[in-house]
C-alpha cells in the first residue's frame, strides 16, 4: 500500500528518476516494486499492519519476522485495508481467506450485487469435509480463525 505525495513527486521529477533507475537496473523481477524500493528505501515510512492486511499475514504460520507477530495478531482483527495478495482471490471459488466475505460485502454495494463464483459440488464436499477434519483436529487449518 502506498501513500504518495504527488505534488512532491512532480516538483522533484520523480517519474524521470524512475526511468533513469530502470536504465541502470535492467534485471528487475518486480519492476514497479523494485524501482520504488530501490529509490525510496532510506526514506520509507512503515505503517501499522492494519493498513495492509495481506494473505500471508492470515496464515497459521505468518510470513513475517517473529518479533512482529504479537503486533500483527492484534492488528489483523480489525483491518483498515485488506490486500488480497497471492494466487487465490475472493472471487475464486477455492479461496479460503478468512476475509473473503468482506470482499462480497462491498461487492454487494455495486452493480455486481449478489455475484458469486460458481462452486462445483466436489469443492463444496471438500469444504464440508475439511471443516469436520479441523473440528476433530485431524487436519491443521491454513488460516487463523478471525473472530467476528
Describe the role of every protein-language-model region.
Residues 1:
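A recurrent flexible, glycine/aromatic-enriched loop bordering the glycosyltransferase active site
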Residues 4-148:
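A glycosyltransferase accessory/donor-loop signature
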Amino acid at each position: 500500500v502506498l501513500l504518495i505525495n504527488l505534488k512532491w513527486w512532480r516538483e522533484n521529477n520523480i517519474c524521470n528518476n524512475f526511468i533513469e533507475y530502470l536504465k541502470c537496473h535492467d534485471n528487475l523481477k518486480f519492476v514497479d516494486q523494485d524501482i520504488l524500493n530501490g529509490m525510496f528505501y532510506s526514506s520509507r515510512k512503515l505503517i501499522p499492519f492494519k493498513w495492509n492486511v495481506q494473505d500471508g499475514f492470515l496464515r497459521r504460520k505468518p510470513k513475517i519476522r517473529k518479533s512482529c507477530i504479537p503486533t500483527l495478531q492484534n492488528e489483523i482483527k480489525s483491518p483498515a485495508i485488506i490486500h488480497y495478495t497471492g494466487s487465490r482471490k475472493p472471487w475464486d471459488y477455492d479461496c479460503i481467506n478468512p476475509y473473503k466475505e468482506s470482499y462480497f460485502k462491498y461487492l454487494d454495494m455495486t452493480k455486481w450485487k449478489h455475484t458469486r463464483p460458481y462452486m462445483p459440488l466436489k469443492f463444496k464436499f471438500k469444504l464440508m469435509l475439511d471443516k469436520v477434519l479441523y473440528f476433530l483436529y485431524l487436519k491443521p487449518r491454513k488460516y487463523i480463525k478471525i473472530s467476528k
